[in-house]
Amino acid sequence: MKMVVLKPKINSKFHFGEGSLERNSKIFHSNSLFSAIVNNYIKLYGREDLEKNIEKIKNIRLSSLLYKIKNIYLIPKPEHPEFYKLKGNPGIKPKDIKKIQFFSIKAYKELLDNELDWKNKIKHIVDYQTINKSIVISEKEIEEIKRIFGIKAEKLKHAKISLISKHLEQKVAIDRLKDITLEKDDKGQLYNIEFIKLNENVEFYFLIDYNNEDKEFIKKLEASIKLIEDEGLGGKRSIGAGFFEKVEIVDLPEDFNEILDENSKYNNLEYKMLLGVGIPNKDDIKNIEYYKLIEIGGYIYSLECLTKPKRNILALTEGSIVKNDFIGDVKDISPQNDDDEQNKNNENNNKLNHKVYTHGKPILLPFNPKRDNYGS
């Protein structure tokens, strides 16, 4: 397994859409990351080579695009009731818990080892170990965070840090098919797009398991990942969004390696947490414990067809909790009408001549749920 670190260009902006240009996701999901890597693979080696290696490519495992603050790596909060419900903790409100979105991997490891006492010391954690009310870090990382951002306050909850900022930009609408400006009352129709920008100390990363020993295939896959430097990620790249100064493939940092190593002491835990989007196969349904759902859709990104919508599909979000036997799946979401007789007889139907896949085999992180009786 490897980590890919993506350093944004200075003043880079990103649009990771969620069905609306005016709404921007903080996470670029693993299914979209898979699509970007596959499209880069085609640009480098052609569709014929892709088809030859399609099963190898479908079997890789990916996390979503996550954040790192220098050497502090953030992962999603587990979608377990323990991290949403309060039981007799004076001075803490339910919203204090619900606002938390991420753990550092070091804090998460301490959670696995029962060193982070979530049940009995939640007020201390919220006051001293939580950045911007949304990111829980280890006590061992507090001084580093204060040094990086010049924080003088004793309690982190009193510090205001702009890690990720949102920006709205106004654009003129263009007809996707005719490539002309859409007008209303003889004026160009305007719309808003939301972008995010990262603090200079914040970068992206994701994890990838090649799940294969074929050195030639791995070399091609890594070249496709490196091409993200030039091709970028996310929407609105035509107007300068989504680009990176550097993309590096590195070994796993120590905390990740200790948790994910094949000989890790955590491998005997019964549960796992998803670090990417999970699409259950028919045998996985019984292994789903706690989850949130995301609807995957949007338009197909292909040089042969730029205006066809994908079939929508529901998937488990990052942070969902499953049992050890969960595998995940890769689904064909090609438009349903591409094979019907009417389209076959229409020369101008803008028909795809290849399959469109969405990836749902995420990196899984061992998870140790509390033994209290939380309801589903």
Curated annotation (Swiss-Prot):
Domain of life: Archaea
GO MF annotation terms: RNA binding
InterPro entries to which the protein is assigned, alphabetical: Csm4, Csm4_C, RAMP_III_fam
Pfam families the record matches: Csm4_C, RAMPs
Signal sequence, renumbered to the chain: none
Region Disordered, residue ranges: 332-355
GO biological-process terms attached to the record: defense response to virus
Presence of keyword RNA-binding: yes
Keywords: Antiviral defense, RNA-binding
Annotated family: Belongs to the CRISPR-associated Csm4 family.
Protein's job: CRISPR (clustered regularly interspaced short palindromic repeat) is an adaptive immune system that provides protection against mobile genetic elements (viruses, transposable elements and conjugative plasmids). CRISPR clusters contain spacers, sequences complementary to antecedent mobile elements, and target invading nucleic acids. CRISPR clusters are transcribed and processed into CRISPR RNA (crRNA).
Note: Encoded in a type III-A CRISPR locus.
Record note on quaternary structure: Part of the Csm effector complex that includes Cas10, Csm2, Csm3, Csm4 and Csm5. Stable Cas10/Csm1-Csm4, Csm3-Csm4 (which crystallizes as 2 heterodimers) and Cas10-Csm1-Csm3-Csm4 subcomplexes can be isolated.
Protein name listed in UniProt: CRISPR system Cms protein Csm4
